[in-house]
């Protein structure tokens, strides 16, 4: 195995694992990293699909007990049935839009300038969402009115994934559609969208993880099938390296993020997005880095 190629696989695998579930856009980072490492040819595109599969398996492993409970309870447990319906409902909008506009989006928006712009806009949206969160609880409601107490200043009305209904799921699914633009971030769109629609930060994050499973798994299978003619046994070693590092880094990232959101907001990610986006635009405009359109 070529050492330089293996090192690229390690770097990209780690980039995928660390960015897939943070609100900073894995696709955007892979587009930029792929260009910097000169690994954005057809083989590189297939490689990205493989490492995404590694990342999603990390989520499946982390939530294996919950997934097993839902699957085993589909026949008789109402809570499991409602949860499965919510995931399906939230998945449909992005699938429909991807089937209709997917080719156009890849042809026109998969470039560093679009990614950088989406980084900045997404960062601003996160800051606005967190500003709204910070105002919650500062407006007091009349004592004795339970409904107003629960909803004062737009306080989260959903504190458990099991409390979601199909309308809530559909709203999150519609928010996920924005993630079709590279640089937006699927997790960022679903988490921030969920928070804006009344989910607590923890619930929005957890539901985003579950929602990633059918979305990324389905996209992986579909893209690998389309690229099957380009698959070669000679590439299995590189694919395996990237897959393993994506799985491990994603597993650690998911566990860390679940702890992080319990006591922190997403402002650090927002500022990172804005700063990173500005840097990419500046390097493009000054010619320091020759980003390809």
UniProtKB/Swiss-Prot annotation:
One of its GO terms (biological process) is cell wall organization. Keywords: Antibiotic resistance, Cell inner membrane, Cell membrane, Cell shape, Cell wall biogenesis/degradation, Hydrolase, Membrane, Peptidoglycan synthesis, Transmembrane, Transmembrane helix. Its EC number is 3.6.1.27. InterPro entries: UppP. This is Undecaprenyl-diphosphatase. GO terms for molecular function: undecaprenyl-diphosphatase activity. Belongs to the UppP family. Catalyzes the dephosphorylation of undecaprenyl diphosphate (UPP). Confers resistance to bacitracin. Bacitracin is thought to be involved in the inhibition of peptidoglycan synthesis by sequestering undecaprenyl diphosphate, thereby reducing the pool of lipid carrier available. The keyword Acetylation does not apply. It comes from the Bacteria. It catalyses: di-trans,octa-cis-undecaprenyl diphosphate + H2O = di-trans,octa-cis-undecaprenyl phosphate + phosphate + H(+). It is a multi-pass membrane protein.
